[in-house]
Amino acid sequence: WVSPLESFLRHTLPTAVLLSGGNDIGEHEERDITEYQLLDYAEKYKLPVLGICRGMQLMATRAGAKLRRVSGHVQTRHKVHGIITAEVNSYHNYAIDNCPKNHTILAKSQDQTIEAIQHDWLPWEGWMWHPEREINFAKNDIDRARFLLRSNQKDDKNKKI
């Protein structure tokens, strides 16, 4: 049996998956199911995935992480440090409680909230901040997203995203 989503994906042949932010996990079951299926498809075909906020939470919970409620992370800015160091915006009520299996932490906030992760062998990253909510995109975000989303292309010299 092939789900309607997988049938659609087989016809459109996406080269990457972007999971956007939005409502909390569990508020809209159909969206949750669809996005988990997108991750299954991306894993099966080794597609790059960029998960923004809720998208990162989906990636993490799919890998076994738990979510916890956090305060002070809605409509604010704060610094993140680690492999990624930046000042970012923040709009989330929940954070992942632990780094999921087969993932590496890329950044944490000052209060030790995990703000970015990457899969250890799949071309997947998750960021809790929202680059799309910035007036000017951060160069670091553009460079990381471009590199990640092009990671499965054979010859990226002439490709534009």
Positions of predicted regions on the chain:
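Active-site-proximal beta-strand elements of phosphoester/diester hydrolases
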Residues: 87-88, 125-129
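Gly/Ala-rich beta-loop-alpha elbow adjacent to hydrolase catalytic centers
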Residues: 51, 55, 60
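Acyltransferase
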Residues: 132-161
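A conserved active-site-flanking secondary-structure segment within enzyme catalytic domains
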Residues: 28-40, 60-88
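Active-site glycine-centered loops adjacent to acidic/histidine catalytic or metal-binding residues
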Residues: 53, 92, 130
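Proline-centered loop/turn at the N-terminus of a beta-strand
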Residues: 48-50, 104, 123
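Flexible gly/pro-rich beta->alpha loop and the following alpha-helix that scaffold active-site loops
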Residues: 1-50, 63
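Catalytic beta-strand/loop cores that center a nucleophilic Ser/Cys/Thr
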Residues: 84-121
